[in-house]
Amino acid sequence: MEWSEVEVHTTNEAVEPVANVLTEFGAAGVSIEDVADFLREREDKFGEIYALKREDYPEDGVIIKAYFLKTAEFVEQIPEIEKTLKNLTTFDIPLGKFQFVVNDVDDEEWATAWKKYYHPVQITDRITIVPSWESYTPSANEIIIELDPGMAFGTGTHPTTQLCIRALSDYLQPNDEIIDVGTGSGVLSIASAKLGAKSVLATDLDEIATRAAEENIILNKTEHIITVKQNNLLQDINKTNVDIVVANILAEVILLFPEDVYRALKPGGIFIASGIIEDKAKVVEEALKNAGLVIEKIEQQGDWVAIISKRGVE
């Protein structure tokens, strides 16, 4: 089989939307090469530094690589993929010195190239995300989330995913009921289930994402707790008295439904919102307040922000 590698050079702020667009066009695998990851010298829990070199990363910004089966249909789609990515600027997503390149790769090369950037990521002292192909021995009481990052965005490496998981770890209580809006790979739903949630409703508008989430949920043996639904945000979701709503999506999307979040939450319920770039945090904060939510805490990692708010106790 012949494969094509789509390489996009863009900004860190654009990582999630670009990865989502590439996935929606049918990418079989997506890798994210961010120099910040190298500079952090991420160590695993045994003190080993993964053997990636400085030259594996771009000088600045982020390179996103996606792999597509080279079919006549894909070749015809190439201009549309580039146009869709460039149109992200209409949502105020900065693309930086946007570059879009398509290369041919052989079967063996594509199957391994994107995997070298994914290794176990320790999110908290209790939670570690492990790629499905990695052999990993957990310590006592360690929560392991297995993911196939090739299927949808949400691998655990992005700061917004990590911020959400840490917030879930802080706020989720045993037997809580959770809604995960824009579930992507299902990572936040799986984390919720493994932290003790009684039930989780995972929604995503994208059919590819819901299928990916279902596969990852089965991989983690949490299908008895998590229900996946293809749905636009919280539209037509009649659940109320929910303990936590979590949404790791773009700030512009969060602005569309804070009133729906308020209605879904029980008094005292928590809304964890991330996917918010720093310069848009104030706008989101004001929208949450206007919907009746009370800001509980704001956390930041790099340029990314998570806002934790609460429905007041009436």
From Swiss-Prot:
Coiled coil: none annotated. Its main location: cytoplasm. Its EC number is 2.1.1.-. SUPFAM superfamilies: S-adenosyl-L-methionine-dependent methyltransferases. It is found in: Cytoplasm. GO terms for cellular component: cytoplasm. InterPro entries: Ribosomal_L11_MeTrfase_PrmA (IPR050078), Ribosomal_PrmA_MeTrfase (IPR004498), SAM-dependent_MTases_sf (IPR029063). Keywords: Cytoplasm, Methyltransferase, S-adenosyl-L-methionine, Transferase. Pfam families: PrmA. GO terms for biological process: methylation. S-adenosyl-L-methionine binds at residues 161, 182, 204, 248. It catalyses: L-lysyl-[protein] + 3 S-adenosyl-L-methionine = N(6),N(6),N(6)-trimethyl-L-lysyl-[protein] + 3 S-adenosyl-L-homocysteine + 3 H(+). It is an enzyme of class 2 (transferase). One of its GO terms (molecular function) is protein-lysine N-methyltransferase activity. Methylates ribosomal protein L11. NCBIfam families: prmA (TIGR00406). Belongs to the methyltransferase superfamily. PrmA family. This is Ribosomal protein L11 methyltransferase. It comes from Listeria welshimeri serovar 6b (strain ATCC 35897 / DSM 20650 / CCUG 15529 / CIP 8149 / NCTC 11857 / SLCC 5334 / V8). The gene is prmA.
